Amino acid sequence: MPEPAKSAPAPKKGSKKAVTKTQKKGDKKRXXXXXXXXXXXXXXXXXXXXXXXXXXXXXXXXMNSFVNDIFERIAGEASRLAHYNKRSTITSR
């Protein structure tokens, strides 16, 4: 039994790389990840702007809530405009 255990780690390393590549290609939840990243970007920007002041967790949660609310309002307005204009897609023109 020790022999298969020795040979198993080398293929696992290669297979892990292949698995992560396929997971990235098949990952369709990018929209949810983008919304969560907004809070991290806002916290990083606040830390860069005022290095002396530390951002509390409550402040980060409030900023995250604000950004998510704005995104939801923009998406709702875009949906309404698309419905009013009887268009299935929204363009920048």
Swiss-Prot record:
InterPro entries: Histone-fold (IPR009072), Histone_H2A/H2B/H3 (IPR007125), Histone_H2B (IPR000558). Monoubiquitination at the C-terminal Lys gives a specific tag for epigenetic transcriptional activation and is also prerequisite for histone H3 'Lys-4' and 'Lys-79' methylation. Phosphorylated on Ser-15 during apoptosis; which facilitates apoptotic chromatin condensation. One of its GO terms (molecular function) is DNA binding. Residues 1-31 are annotated as: Disordered. Keywords: Acetylation, Chromosome, DNA-binding, Nucleosome core, Nucleus, Phosphoprotein, Ubl conjugation. Pfam families: Histone (PF00125). This is Histone H2B. It comes from Crocodylus niloticus.
